[in-house]
Amino acid sequence: MLSTMCFLWDTECPLYVYFCFFIIVLIVWQVRQNYQGLKCENRRSCCRRHQKVRQRAKDAASRARRLSREEDEKPCELLSIMKSQSWVPKQGNVRQLLCLDPSCQICEATTLEIRQLLQSKKSQISPALLGLPQRAACLEMPISSESFEWNQDFYSRYSTNSPVVPGNQTLTQLTEELTESTNADGVLLCWTDPLQIGQEFHLADMPMASETLVSPGLEEPVVLMNEEDTVHSNLNYIQQLQDHEALNSQIPFQTLTPQLTVTHPMAVSIVTDAPQPFLSPEVLRLLEIHVKKLMHFQRWGLPRRVEESLKQFMPNPPVYLPPEHNQPVSFILNTSSQDCVHRFEGISPETWYSYMDGQPIQTFWVSEWSSGDQGQRLSCKPIPSPVEKPLLTPDYELLHDLCLSPEGQVDGSQSNLQKKFTQLFCGLPSMHSESLGSTFLCTQGVSKNTLKPPYKEPHFLKVSPPIPLPEAAPPPSSTSPNESLDEPQRAQIGGVPFLTLSECKTLEWHLLQRQLQLQWGLPAVIARPPRVQSHTQYKHKPWNKAKPRETLKFFGPGKPFSALTRELFFIPQHARRLLEFHLQKRLIHLRWGLPQRIQRSINMLLSSTDLQSLPCGGSRLPNVSISQPGKPEAYGSGDTFLPTAGKGTTPMPHLFAKAQEMLKSHDTKCEQIREGKVPACVQSAWKGRIPGDLAAGTLFPNIPQGQPLELQAENNPDLHQEAVSWKPMDLDQEAQAFSGVFIEHCRRPQALSEETIKKLETTLRHKYLAFLSGLQALYCMAPTKATSPTVDQSVITTMPWSVKSPQKPLSQKSPLEALCLSGLEPCTQDDKETSANIAEEFQHGAQGHGRTEKVPPERQPLLNRPYSLDTEIMERVSFYLKRKALDIKLGISLKESVFQEPTATDLESESVQEPLGSPRESTLLQGPPTLCHVPVAPDPDKVCLKQPATAVQVVFQEQNQPSSRAVPHRSARQGSQVHRNMMEAQVHYVQMGTGGEMLNLGEPFSTESQSPGKSKSGYVPTVAGKRKIPGKPKVVGDLGEGDAGLGFSLVSLKTRQDGEQEKRLLHRQLQGSSLQAQTFHLEGACPHSPQESPELQFADPPPEVFMETDSEQDMEDSQSKESIVPEPARTAKAPQPMLSRASQGLPFPRSPTQRKPSQGQPGPGHVPPGHATPASPYTRPSRLPEAGLKNKMKLFFHSIKLKMKSKAHTEPSTVSTPGKVAKTSKENIDRGLPQAKSPTKKTKPEDFRGPKAQFSVVGPCLTPSYILDSKFWPRPRRVGSVSVLGHSYHCPRHCPRLAYANQQRNPP
C-alpha cells in the first residue's frame, strides 16, 4: 500500500508542482492588478478633481468676462441714450460736479460729452468719439499687417515726461497723413486696462486756446474706417469741418507715441451726430444710481476686500483737497516720484498755486480716515509749480454761472435758475435730494458745532406760514462773504465732496422741510411767503466762546418766520424727540389755543403793530382777554388778536366754556365741603337715584340740608366723632382734622354698624367659598340668606321704610348645606307656620348669643334697603322655575302634597301637647336620638341626596343653644323640640318619597358613595364644632365624636312588589334567620335577612318601643339599671377596643370598601371571635312600592294618633314593645333558636360610656314626629347595645336575645 502511494507520488509530483506554481502566479497577478487598480483609481480621482477645479476656473473666468462685458455695455447704453438726446447746457466746467475720481469712466465720458455739446455751435465735434468705455475701447482703423511695438509704460496718465504734440497740427494734416495709404486692412485695436496689463497708448495733454477745453486723456475711442467704404463721406465731412469756424481750434485728439511704427498710413474718419435732448428719465435714473453709489463709497468706503484689491492696482491713490469759500473741489494725485496737478477747468497759475499752497489734503481710502489722527490724515504738503505743463486761465463766466453766488447778489429768478441747473448738473432732481441728503450730508467734515455763514433761502421754501413763530438764529458767521475763514474751519467745511457750501445748506433745508411735512402731514408748516425777506440781525462773539446773544425782530403782516435751522438736522436723537414733542404741542395750541403763560410771553414780545391774523382751521372760536390769570372772561368773537395795552387775547375753543362751568362747580363743592355741608350736586344725585319714598329727607332725617355738621353734632351726640369744627391749631392737627372731615364727607352720610359690617364680611367669605367650590349660581345666594335674620312684624313697624315680608320665603341654605349640595337639587320648603317658627327660634338663639340687636331707624344701614318689586319678583320666579325643573326631573312634586296635609295640621297640634319629660331630655337634643328599628341600605346607584333648609336651620339653632341645664325656661325647649321633631318627620318623608339619602352636616363633606353590604360607612361625618364637655352626662351613642344625632345615614327603600310577595319573602327570611349567627352588618338589619324591612308594613298598630334612660339625676335610674339585659352586653365584648377608641374620641380603623355583603369580608368589630357571617342569597336592592305609599303613610299617622291618645298618661321613660315583635320573638324561640343566657347584672352609671352600656331612648320618642323619625331616620348602628358607626348591631326582630329580653321585661 505504501509502495502504491509512493508510486503515485512519484508519477504525479510534477503535476502538483505545476499546479502550485500556477496558483502562486495567479495570486501574484491578482495582487498586482489590485495594486495597479488602486493607483489608477487614485489617478483617476485626482484627474476628476483637477478637471473640476479647471472647470470651475473656466466658469469663473467666463462669468467674470460676461459680467465685465455687461458692465461695459451699461455705459455704452447710457452714452448712446445721451447721444440720442439734444441737451445743450448753458454752463461748462461740470466735471467736478459729477465725480472726483479721475478714473471714473461714466463721469469722464459725460464730461467730454457735455463740453463738446457746449462747443457744438462752433466746432460741431462729434459725440460719437465717446462711443465705448475706456477698458473696452476699441480702435478700428485700416493698418498694415506689420505688428506694433507696444510700450510697457504706455498710457501712463500720471507720467510727466509725455511729449507734447505741436500746437500747429490741425485736423486736416492728421487726415492727410493718415489717408496716404492705399492698401490697408481693417485691424481692431483694443485698448486694455493699463492697471491690469500695462500696454496702452501714451497720451499727453495738448496746449489749446482759451476757448477750448483740455481733455484729461484720450478716454474716448477713435473709430478708423476703411478707405474704400468711407472715403467719400469722410471727404465731405472734413470739408464741412474746414468750413466751420471751429476748424481753427484744436481738437482733443492725441497722436500715438513715436515707438508705435506705422508702415502703412491709415485714414481717420470722425463722425458727429446732430445735437439732441440730453436728459431723459432713463439717463437721470442711471446717473442718480451712479452718484448715489459713488457718494456712499466716499462716505463709508468700499468693502474691505474690494479696497484691498484696489490698493494693489492703485499704490498711489489721489488725495482730496477741501474747497475755499464757494470754489469747487479738486484733487491731488500723490506719486512716489513727484506731484503733479491735473485740473479739468481753466485756472490761472497764480490762482492755482495760491490756492494749493498750505492747503490740507485728505487720503483717498475712507477706511484710513479712522485709523490715524486727523492732523496726520490732513497733512499739508507744498507742491512745486509744474513748469513743463502750462495751465490756462479759468473761464470766470462759467465759474460764475455754475457756482452759487453770495447772498444778496442775485435775484429770485437767477436763484431759481441756479437751483435748477445745480440739480441738473449733479444729476439730482428734487425728488432724489432727500435720499442723497440722508447719505452724504453728515460727512466727517461737517459737524453740528461748525459755524457757517448765513445764507439766503431758495425760492421753493417761501410759502406763507399758518402761525407766527419767532425765528431761531442760525449760527453766526462773518459779515462779509469775502472774509476768509480760519484754516481748521475750512478743513471742516470741505466734508461734502462735490457740493458747495450754499448747495449743502439749501439741500439740507429742503430735506428738513420734507421730513417734517411727511411726518406731520402738514404741507406748509414751515413755509415762507415769497414777497418778503427776513429781517434778523445777529450779534456774535468769538468762535471759542458761547453762542452769541440774539436780537430777534418779529415780522409784521405777511413777513416770514421759521423755528427750524439747519443745525436741527445734526442734533442728537433725544433733542429731536423734544422737537417733535414741541411740534405736537404747537399743533394742539393751533386747535385749542395757547396756555396762559405762553400767551403772556407772546404778548410781551409782540408789539401792537406786529399783530397779524390767525386762521384757526376755518372755525371762528371765541377770544378771551387775559387780564388776570385764572379768571378768563369772554371778550368777543373773531379771528385776530385784540390789541390791548397790558392784556393779550388768544383763540379759545367752545369747550373752554364747559370747562369753566366745571371749574366753578368744583369750587362751589369744595367750599361746601369746607363749611361742613353736603354738596348740592351730591344731594341732587341722591334725589335722582333713590326711588319712591327713599328720598333724601326720609333717608337722612337728622341731617337737614344746609345745616353744618357742627350743629348736627350738637343735636346728635353720635356725630361728634364725624364733625370737627375749625379752630386755630397746628399744621399737623389741621391736616388731620381736614382729612377726617373729608373722609367723612366722601363716605355716605350714615356709617354702617358693626353688625352690618360683620354680616357683609361673612357674606363675602361665603361667596368666596362658593366660588372656590365651583357652585352654581342657584346656591351662591344661600349663605347671605342663611346668615341674615328674618324681619318680623315688630321690626317692620320700627323701620323708616316699608319692608314687605314674603308669605312663603325662599328656601335658605346654610354654608355647609351650600357646600355639601353642590350640584344637587334644592330641598322642599315648609309651610307658613314652620317658617315663622324657624324665624323665631333663629332670632331667639341669636339674641341669646348677643349677635342681633335692634338698630334705631336713623342708624339703619343703607344696604338693608329692600329690593325693588321687579327685582324681587324676578328672583322669586327664577328660583321657583329652577326648583320646579329639579322637582319634575327627580319626581318630588307629586309626593310633596301628600305629606304636607297631615304634617301641617294633625302632627303639629298633637306634638305640641306631648310632655317632654325631665330636663335631661334637653341634653339629648345635642345627642343622637336612638333608633328602635334599623332600615336597610339602599342601592348607591339610585341614591339622591336631599336636605331641607329647615333642618339645617334647626341644626345651627341647636348648635348655638346653650346647655339644657343652663336654660331656665322649659317652653323654649319644648317649642324647639316639637319643631325639630316635625322637621325630622318631613325630612324622612322626603327621603323615602324620592329615594334619596341624607348626608351628615357635621364634618366636611365627602363624595364617597355608600354601597350595600359595606362593612363600614363610607361617609361618617361628625360635627367638628362639638367637643366632649367634661361633666356632661353622655348618652350611649355619643362617643366623643360630636353630635351623632345630627348625622344622617343612608335610608333604604322597598322594591316595587305587591303585598303577597313581601309576605312570602318575609316568611322565607324569618326561616333563614334562625340558622344564622347573631352578628349583623351596618346597613342591613341582619346578614341573612332581606333588605325589604317588614317594619315598613303598617298593617298593625304601631308597636311600643323598649326604652331606657341614661340620666344620672332621674329617680328611675335604678329601674333602668336593673332592666338591662346582660346578654347583649356580653355579646358586645368583642368590639370593645373599637368602643374604647370611640369613647376617647379617636377615629375608627377602616377596612376596604366592599361592594356586596356576600363577599364575606366583615369590617372590624363586626364578627366576634369564632363566628362567621354567611352571605344571604336573598340580598338585593330594595325599593318601596310607590303605589301603596300614600295609603300606608295615612294608616301610619292615623295609628300614631290613636296610640298617642290611648297612651297619654303612660310613663315617658318606658313603652311596651309591639305585639307583632313579641309574636315574632316567640316564633323564633319555638323554632329552636338558642336561648339567651340572662344572668342579671347591675350596671354602674359610668358604664353608660363603656362598651357594655345599653342604648336608651328618651321621652321625645313618644311624639309622633319622633316616632316617624325613629322609624325612617337612619341613625348610627350599635353593636349589641352600643352605638358604633360602621359596626354591626342586634335587631329586635331577628335577634332572639333581645326578643327574649323584651318578652321577659314586658310579659303579654
Swiss-Prot record:
A Pfam family annotated for this UniProt entry: FAM75
UniProt biased composition (Acidic residues): 1107-1117
Localization annotation: Membrane
Compositionally biased spans, kind Pro residues: 465-478
Membrane topology according to the record: Single-pass membrane protein
Coiled-coil regions listed: none
UniProt-listed InterPro entries: SPATA31 (IPR039509), SPATA31F3-like (IPR027970)
Any one cellular-component term (Gene Ontology): membrane
Region described as Disordered: spans on this chain: 464-488, 627-648, 844-863, 902-927, 1005-1026, 1084-1190, 1204-1254
Key words, A-Z: Membrane, Transmembrane, Transmembrane helix
Transmembrane segments: 7-27
Family label: Belongs to the SPATA31 family.
Protein name: Spermatogenesis-associated protein 31F1B
